[in-house]
Structure formats: C-alpha cells, structure tokens
Amino acid sequence: MLTKSSALKTTFSGVDYSKYESKIVDFVNEFSSRANKPGKFLNWVNLPQEQLKRIDDIYSLVSKLKTQSGVDKLTVLGIGGSKHTVEHMLAINGLNLCGESILFYSDVDSISFNRFLSKLNNKFLTSNYKVASKSGSTFETKDGFLRIQKMLEEAYLAKGLSQEEAKKSASKHFIAVTDCNSEKSELRRTSNDNSWLGDLYIHDDVGGRFSAFDDHALFSLAFAGMKKDDMAKMLNAAQEVSNLSLEANLDLNDALKEGIFWADAKLNGISASVHQYMGSMFENTVYWHAQMQNESVKDTLKQVAKVPDAMHHSAEAHFNPANKLVFALTVPVDNGVCSSNAKAYIEALTKSYDVTGATFVELIETSDLGLTPEAAGTVTQLRAFATCYQEIVEAVMQNKQLPEVLDSVLQPHVEFYKKNLKGGVVAPGRIG
C-alpha cells in the first residue's frame, strides 16, 4: 500500500489492511468526534490554519525583539515539547545549522549552566531569551530564567544604570510564550508586570509534543531566517494532512495507514518497534518523535534513532531471531553526490528489516539543506495523527471503549517526579 501525499511517499509491507476496512469509518469517527473540541487536547488539528493568520504578527515580534535589545541571537529556555519541537523544526528546515542564531538551555546543574554561558563567551547581553512554559512554573525553565534575569540586571548595573533602568534594559531581552490568561500563568504575569514584548501564546488543548506549529516554534523559525512564504507553505501542508486525516477513506488517509501499521503489531503480540530516520537533518527529530511516542503510547517503548548510527549500536539486537519487531525507515530524496551510496544503504536496510516483520519506508522531498517546507509540514503533522490513531485502532479492534479524552494526548505519569519538586526553585528572584 502506498501513501498519496506529493511531499511524502510511503510503501507499507507485511500488514493486511483488508482486515481493517470494515472499521475505517469507526476509526475516523472516534477521532473526528473529539477533534478541536474544548478539553479534548486535540486543538492542534486545525492549529496550522489558525497560525496562518498570525504569520505577520510573529515576524513583526521577531523584528521588534531584535531592535529593542540590539542583538540578533536567541536562547530558548524551555524543556520537553517547548524545546524538542523547536529543535526538530529548525533542523528539518535547514536552519540554525551551526547554532548561529539560536541556542538552547534546559538544564539545572552548574556544569551545564557554565557550558551554556561559554557558548555566549560569558557575554549574556548578546542574546535574547524566549521563555516557554504553559504555566510559567516549569522547574527547569524557571531555574534558568531566574538566573539569567538576575545576571542581565547585574550586567546593566555594572554599566552604571540605576536599579530601575537595569531592570528595564534586562526586560528588553525577554519574550514569553505561555498561557494567554495571566490568572493561569505565572510567566504571563511576569511578562505583563515587566512590560516584556508580547504576545506569544501556547494555545489551549495543545500538548507540548503536539505543538510544532504553535507560537514558540514559528517564532524560532522566523528568528532563524525562515521566509514568510515558506512558513505559509509549511502550515498549508500541515493543514492538508489534518483535513485528509479525518477522511474515512484509507486511500487518502495516510495517518490512519500508519496508525494501523503500529497497532497491528501490538494486536499481534509484537511490542517492540523501531523507527529510524536517515541523515543528520533528523538528529533532533528523533528526540521529538521519541517524546511523542513514549508520552503517548505508554505501555511500550519504541526505539527512535538516526541511521547510519543506529546500525552500529542496535543492529545486533534488531537482527537477533529471538526478537520480534516492526520497522519504519524515513529517508530523504537524494539527488546529490552521495545518492548512489545512499540508495544502496537504503536498499540494504529495507531488505534486512523486511525479514524481521512488517515494515514501511517513507521517502520525503528535500531542499538543499533539509526538507521542503511542504514536506516539513506534512511529516510533522502526520506523526501526531498516526500516534493518536494507534490508540483508536487498538481499542476499536478489541471492542474496548475509548475514554472521552484520548490517553495518547495526556501525560499523567509525569507528575510522579514533578510532585517531588514541589519545594519551588531555589534561585535568585521570583516569578509572579
């Protein structure tokens, strides 16, 4: 079975899709009945088309931040989806290849903080800071923000500014991405109280791993130099995936094909699965996709890795006859100087994994340094839908009732460690 997308072509093998044809309408109805409904955490379905209306505002905010601070570097202070979605989107769009525009900080230990400062040559006034947190109280993000805020103020005091002037000058380096409601977000209150540049939002009912088209990612892409037209192409392609993913026609619904592929393995007692991405553009995609998978499909662990590297750390286990697994491979269209060897490598992987179980191979359209904008939008939105469809297919095929809010969009178990951090952040200053 093949996919129909112009930016992405996938060949599936080893799954009998005819077994699922009678349930296609049921699968889609379960999804569409929840999509874009308040409290269902599926507001990301139509987010791309809503974000098309905000492109001009986002680019204007980028320009204003650079102008008011006088610097053209950005540090992203965020963790989880607030970090991995941005890293993924920058990389697949061929931006920020050398960290020339955007840095990231998401740690809480002293060595990591010192290493981050060294990337700025300890000149922290040379960067702007985007603080991304829905609540504004995320431990790791809050720790980094409070330290940097104090250092900025002290640096301006050292320049001879008064306390009030130093605080105002430091504030010119910050922009918040958080809940629009100040009653819900400490960070929004901080932004308002300190007259930070605004407004960037984390939309309601959009979980971090599903937020690749939310403000924090689009702002970062614009900051790194993505053209407006390319952003529009990317968002339009993502919305087209959303539209087709709610079609009760398996010939059109590529996301459902993928969801069935992964569900079929579990329904047949195969819990191990592997998804590999070929090439350096996917170095960060594997972290984002691993988060998407392991926070959504909680009863199994999927290995998401980059090749060729994975063939030198996991092949022994993958090809051990005692292990049963299903396999997916995402590869870029290659018409360059390495294309012959790349094609041979892909053929070798496909042939090798074909004997381990069901497989699909995904071929994505490329530009010089990454994917085309259309391909970037397509593959990113496709992953979100396929992840949720896996849960739906498994439940429907086993005659199990699905919860009102899909388990794949929630993350209740993360509170297991967060509850042990309830003492707050021990750092200079405060939020709220």
Question: How should these model regions be labeled?
Answer:
Residues M1-G432:
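Phosphate-moiety recognition in structured ligand-binding domains
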